Amino acid sequence: MRLSFAAAISHGRVYRRLGLGPESRIHLLQNLLTGLVRHERIEASWARVDELRGYAEKLIDYGKLGDTNERAMRMADFWLTEKDLIPKLFQVLAPRYQGQNGGYTRMLQIPNRNQQDRAKMAVIEYKGNCLPPLPLPRRDSNLTLLNQLLRGLRQDQEASTRSSHPAQTPEV
């Protein structure tokens, strides 16, 4: 007898669906990538930004090949829906990262959307842009579970040492 149950199996999918189908996904990524090249910083849901990051990095790699490379021009023409951004890719963004191998983008999580669907949101930007820098999130290490437990342990130890050794009052 064979038992089976429904499980969340990806069946070879290595990317997020992000929409109604493969064509919708490509159009969404093209629009996001065009916005990123134009503004050098965009805000979207975490899933979209995370999926976009690889394409943004690869587009810069193609841009570094130069505008005389036929494959680089075809990729730029395909992914950028606004054709006035192709010179920006080859003349502004690619020279900025000429001596760098990868790591052209930065992703930061921002607070979730309040009024709509509470989606996890993020910002993606090209490093070295002229926009004011985003504040990097700093976690308060005093609030982590481990530090809370250690603080409680120290307080318990101090309380037990005080109770076992009462303070001696000087006699006059």
Curated annotation (Swiss-Prot):
One of its GO terms (cellular component) is mitochondrial large ribosomal subunit. It holds the Pfam family Ribosomal_L17. GO terms for molecular function: structural constituent of ribosome. Residues 1-8 form a transit peptide. It is found in: Mitochondrion. GO terms for biological process: translation. Transmembrane segments: none annotated. It comes from the Eukaryota. The keyword Ribosomal protein applies. InterPro entries: Ribosomal_bL17, Ribosomal_bL17_sf. Gene3D superfamilies: Ribosomal protein L17 (3.90.1030.10). Keywords: Mitochondrion, Ribonucleoprotein, Ribosomal protein, Transit peptide. Component of the mitochondrial ribosome large subunit (39S) which comprises a 16S rRNA and about 50 distinct proteins. Belongs to the bacterial ribosomal protein bL17 family. PANTHER family: LARGE RIBOSOMAL SUBUNIT PROTEIN BL17M, RIBOSOMAL PROTEIN L17. This is Large ribosomal subunit protein bL17m. It comes from Bos taurus (Bovine).
